[in-house]
Amino acid sequence: MITRMSQLFLRTLRDDPADAEVPSHKLLIRAGYIRPVAPGLYSWLPLGLRVLRRIEHIVREEMNAIGGQEILFPALLPRAPYEATNRWTEYGDSVFRLQDRRGNDYLLGPTHEELFTLTVKGEYSSYKDFPVLLYQIQNKYRDEARPRAGILRVREFVMKDSYSFDIDDAGLKAAYHAHREAYQRIFARLQVRYVIVSAVSGAMGGSASEEFLAESPVGEDTFVRCLESGYAANVEAVITARPDPQPVEGLPEAVVHDTGDTPTIATLVDWANRAGLGRTVTAADTLKNVLLKVRQPGGDWELLAIGLPGDREVDDKRLGAALEPAEYVLLDDADFARYPFLVKGYIGPKALKDNGVRYLVDPRVVDGTSWITGADEPGRHVVGLVAGRDFTADGTIEAAEVRDGDPSPDGAGPLVSARGIEVAHIFQLGRKYTDAFTADVLGEDGKPVRLTMGSYGLGVSRMVAVIAEQHHDELGLRWPASVAPFDVHLVIANKDAQARAGATALADDLDRLGVEVLLDDRQASPGVKFKDAELLGVPWIVVVGRGWADGVVELRDRFAGQTRELATGPSLAADIAAALRG
């Protein structure tokens, strides 16, 4: 197929959009692949849609290869199925809800576990019908509070979501493994650099869960890995290496001290090192207590205290994952006024216990560890408060930040952190959704068998931005051949009529060989055409320029930055096609 730029719906921009933050956003706008409509909403213009469709094609091929069958559900979904799984409430403000003219509630689908489960239940009733693997590629909707980074975080996006249904856990694990391998093949074909990390399931539910993160400095997800062992996990899923408990017998008694105006960890440590305690005190020796209000879906607000070493900050993502599906907020001044037993800056475990406040601590707070913490009075702290002797928590929580150098949970070495963009997430859901809808089939022994389920998502439209992030230079985009909008960008950089005719004939010859050609036949200067060719990012550029009179054209490799000359003649199109094939 030949597409003429003189007829293509395209306008490139020389300057970056004022609101663009990341390279992919800047380049996809400048190159005319997408255009903004509203915050978090984008239109796909012809070039962008071609890239999107090529990614979809690769995803379909790999899903079909593992036995997937494509279907399509509506994006507008009724309330009832989501009530059955409690996700109507659990999703909170992150979904778009609406009513029809009769007052019936609907949402714009963020994901479709409920509909897939109900459909399979309605169609199949015997173990002989399984396993089943269904998928769709469809628009999804989430009411992002802060859409950002172009099409990386939006309110409408294209996603491939697939669902496996099996009669036993062995079948589920096989389907999960098949998807894991299929995704690795997809990302290899897309030339995306990625890492597979352990993850949390969140509102999706289930047990085993892994994310595929594309390595990128603009990624919103922080992950850690151990270079010695290959362990990798999203920070939300990291399990803190828990020290062994220590005996409490023989430890000095806790002593309350007047510490003056020391409401922060820094001021407390400064006091401790001037108080003659007989040792150097660091923030890691202190226990700070953070107060929250938490509310389960449909419930009331309750107080929750979290204790963690003073040298650690609370990681909002880890805290949110640990409390899922509850929502939470930090206490404000009005809350502290409402609970006078909470002395801000001097909170200790005693007042929490005496007033029935649930208290969860970091896994490093084990029996036998000694701490400096609040004494529940202004200007007073207690030194030598021993866990397991002087206070006991109600449990542990993974809410503290994870740092470079922390020990890996597998004990193999230190952790190092990096940033990534989530491009896929796979879950072994188990029976959460089939339990909600009593999705049973008749087993081989004639008794009911509850189906078990897997869910496997892949961000198709996000992948366009991810590839742009990983494959660009200072001149513009550099699409891998597997997803590029065209195979060859043929630039006519010569006003000579014979050269133009020769370029048109070359485009026809390439078309007959199955090469998709973008022919720049515009009445524009060579400089403008070259800048656009570099910006658009088609992997191969053929220039019909001044060398045409000498019997040569230029072939430029957009990835390698190399240029070579090819002789004109009957074999020119075949020579170019051979270069494309490598």
UniProtKB/Swiss-Prot annotation:
GO terms for molecular function, please? Answer: aminoacyl-tRNA deacylase activity; ATP binding; proline-tRNA ligase activity
Location of the protein in the cell:
Cytoplasm
Q: Which GO terms describe its cellular component?
A: cytosol
Q: Which reaction does it catalyse?
A: tRNA(Pro) + L-proline + ATP = L-prolyl-tRNA(Pro) + AMP + diphosphate
Q: Domain of life here?
A: Bacteria
Q: What is its main location?
A: cytoplasm
Q: Name one Pfam family in it.
A: HGTP_anticodon
Q: What is its EC number?
A: 6.1.1.15
| Family to which the UniProt record says this protein belongs | Belongs to the class-II aminoacyl-tRNA synthetase family. ProS type 1 subfamily.
Task: Summarize the protein's role.
Answer: Catalyzes the attachment of proline to tRNA(Pro) in a two-step reaction: proline is first activated by ATP to form Pro-AMP and then transferred to the acceptor end of tRNA(Pro). As ProRS can inadvertently accommodate and process non-cognate amino acids such as alanine and cysteine, to avoid such errors it has two additional distinct editing activities against alanine. One activity is designated as 'pretransfer' editing and involves the tRNA(Pro)-independent hydrolysis of activated Ala-AMP.
> Which NCBIfam families does the UniProt record give?
PRK09194.1 (NF006625), proS_fam_II (TIGR00409)
Give the quaternary structure.
Homodimer.
- Please give the name of this protein: Proline--tRNA ligase
Organism classification, top ranks?
Answer: Bacteria, Bacillati, Actinomycetota, Actinomycetes, Mycobacteriales
Encoding gene, per UniProt annotation: proS
